[in-house]
Swiss-Prot record:
N-glycosylated; paucimannose-type structures containing xylose. Expressed in seed (at protein level). Belongs to the 7S seed storage protein family. Keywords: Allergen, Glycoprotein, Seed storage protein, Signal, Storage protein. This is Vicilin Jug r 6.0101. CDD domains: cupin_7S_vicilin-like_C (cd02245), cupin_7S_vicilin-like_N (cd02244). One of its GO terms (biological process) is seed maturation. Residues 67-100, 374-401 are annotated as: Disordered. The lineage of its organism: Eukaryota, Viridiplantae, Streptophyta, Embryophyta, Tracheophyta.
């Protein structure tokens, strides 16, 4: 009797549901996502796992739809006229409607997705704007993994720095025929050299693992890939790219056995592991002292939160790696910092002399404001839903546009060198921001407010000439604030689209 495959009714229902939602897209915007999830939750034929999978599919469809809309909008804008002029030509004629310094969910590509987690990679910075070409060869990626999961081995054609934002993991690397296991936790930073085989587990039984990575490609500028040796069909093993004759000779194994080995794995990059497997892989941590970053050539992780904060008061705390101490980050010209801004408070304004700051929002909400001299005054820059607004004033000499962006968990924003910036937490919750400073060597942070602000260092005559205002009054204003770096935030936070940022 011929075999007839049976398609589960739950799969048919899910396919039909997504098709219905795709039809609704013509008439609806965000409400379609809400409707899709509502339908998922009320499907009686679905068990809880199928309902969760259905809702994740809704999210994925919604993100892909937003990305398509953005791509279509960009294509239509390419045909629009651009202002002539040397400066604008040199900067790539920046006339996009989007705020070029803020990145949201739809700006991430999902490279890995399984039932147990996902890996997202932020688009290349210069895809958004040539203004960001100074950080073109850096990429940001985010790993999320469910409790007690295994992330399969891979190596990357990029230098890799990881920061454990949430959870507990065991990271295993193989170098020079030596395996090293490192139990890491929230606040740990670890450098993984290009080409190093690495795999990890989420060893926590309850908490999700959330790791933020910054990568500097070493092969193709601005592009990187993960190479999976261990695997089969999903993840695909790079061994499968070789002929069977070469594999038989190299591994000294018959083809039929090789076909079984490299065709077995179909579960994906992030898979569930048993408690026994997790326990076994997490108990072998190396006992070599963690001497990094205070000299030596160790590859051990270093916990940022075990250092004393470089700035601390009731309005926030700032933890920073010192480029002079962190020898492993020196050749990358990179510094890592973490700001915890108390709810209702703010950091800055300040600017960096050399470093461009790439910031990832970990927890909380708020917004940032930045002064930018590069953007066109025509149009309304940054009028992106949920992101920002902008303003530019015409003056004799340099003119600065206000860049403002709303901040939520998972968002990325960039403050280029020399650009004055302030970050404000909502009044409801602390705002936690992870920062990677590119071009960190020799960088100086110049405060524009607080007891050590740069104006206080000006000579009396310089103050009068610069502001066309009595020096005494200038000093009174700039010496009013006796705190440093972190300050009380605005008493009234701005609104966007009729709703307050908080």
């Amino acid at each position: 009797m011929a075999f007839k495959p049976k398609i589960p009714i739950a799969l048919l229902l899910l396919t039909s549901l997504l098709a219905i939602c795709a039809g609704l897209a013509l008439a609806m915007q965000d409400p379609e996502l809400k409707q899709c999830k509502h339908q998922c939750r009320h499907q009686r034929q679905f068990d809880e796992q199928e309902k969760e999978h259905c809702q994740r599919s809704c999210d994925e469809y919604h993100i892909e739809k937003k990305a398509r809309e953005r791509a279509e909008r960009r294509r239509s804008e390419e045909g629009s006229s651009r202002e002539e002029g040397y400066e604008e030509e040199e900067l790539g004629g920046e006339r996009e409607e989007e705020n070029p310094y803020v990145f949201e969910d739809e700006d991430f590509e999902t490279r890995v997705r399984t039932d147990e987690g996902r890996i997202q990679v932020l688009e290349k910075f210069t895809k958004r704007s040539k203004l960001l070409r100074g950080i073109e060869n850096f990429r940001v990626a985010i790993l999320e993994a469910n409790p007690q999961t295994f992330i399969s081995p891979a190596h990357f054609d990029a230098e890799l720095v990881v920061f454990v934002a949430k959870g507990r993991a065991t990271i295993t690397t193989v170098r020079e025929e030596k395996r090293e296991n490192f139990n890491v936790e929230q606040g740990d930073i670890m450098r993984i050299p290009a080409g190093t085989p690495v795999y990890l587990i989420n060893r926590d039984e309850n908490e999700k693992l959330y790791i933020v990575k910054i990568l500097r490609p070493v092969s193709v500028p601005g592009h990187f890939e993960a190479f999976h040796g261990s695997g089969g069909e999903d993840p695909e093993s790079f061994y499968r790219a070789f002929s069977w004759e070469v594999l038989e000779a190299a591994l000294k194994t018959r083809r039929d056995q090789l076909e079984k080995l490299f065709g077995k794995q179909t579960q994906g990059v992030i898979i569930k592991a048993s408690k026994e497997q997790i326990r076994s892989m997490s108990k072998h941590e190396e006992t070599t002292p963690r001497i990094w970053p205070f000299g030596g050539d160790s590859t051990h992780p270093f916990n940022l939160f075990h250092k004393r904060p470089s700035q601390s008061n009731q309005f926030g705390r700032l933890f920073e790696t010192d480029p002079k101490e962190c020898k492993q980050l020196q050749d990358l010209d990179l510094m890592v910092s973490f700001a915890n801004i108390t709810k209702g408070s703010m950091a800055g304004p300040y600017y960096n002399s050399r470093a461009t700051k790439i910031s990832v929002v970990i927890e909380g909400e708020g917004y940032f404001e930045m002064a930018c001299p590069h953007l066109s005054s025509s149009g309304s820059r940054g009028q992106r839903e949920g992101s920002g607004s902008s303003r530019r004033r015409s003056r004799s000499g340099p003119s600065y546009q206000q860049i403002r962006g709303r901040l939520r968990p998972g968002m990325v924003f960039v403050a280029p060198a020399g650009h004055p910036v302030a970050v404000i937490a909502s009044r409801n919750k602390n705002l936690q921001v992870l920062c990677f400073d590119v071009n960190a060597q020799g960088n100086i942070r110049f405060p524009l407010a607080g007891k050590n602000n740069i104006v206080n260092e000006f000579e009396k005559e310089a103050k009068e000439l610069a502001f066309n205002f009595p020096a005494r009054e200038v000093e009174k204003i700039f010496r009013n604030q006796d705190q440093e770096f972190f300050f009380p935030g605005p008493s009234r936070q701005p609104e966007e689209g009729g709703r307050a940022f908080e």
